[in-house]
């Protein structure tokens, strides 16, 4: 079982992560989202408020959990995100893969609305920088996270 560091950008310290059902679903449905990319978490924290915080967690995988992993943007990834953003609730404990960031999200929404084709979507996103997200969708999954520290990114 490997131990890796994950980051969560927020406007508050999150010692005890929770899964919250909100008005809008995210790429992989409702869950607690982290990334293995510190700079990405920093951007999430910085844009959320004047008091941005990057929370740092150690993550130890659990082979008993149901995990879905997308190594890159694929048709399956696109279809899964489309379903989740439309309200689909899956039974995975953890989902990991690329993130539909703000730019990609606009292309995704145009694809879902039928304004562009699947081929056009892939053409538009193929040169975008890599992103990463890992989302936790059950209490068993959240038990894989251990809060290490938080860092304020702006004052």
Question: What function would you assign to each model-found segment?
Answer:
Residues 9-27:
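Hydrophobic transmembrane alpha-helices
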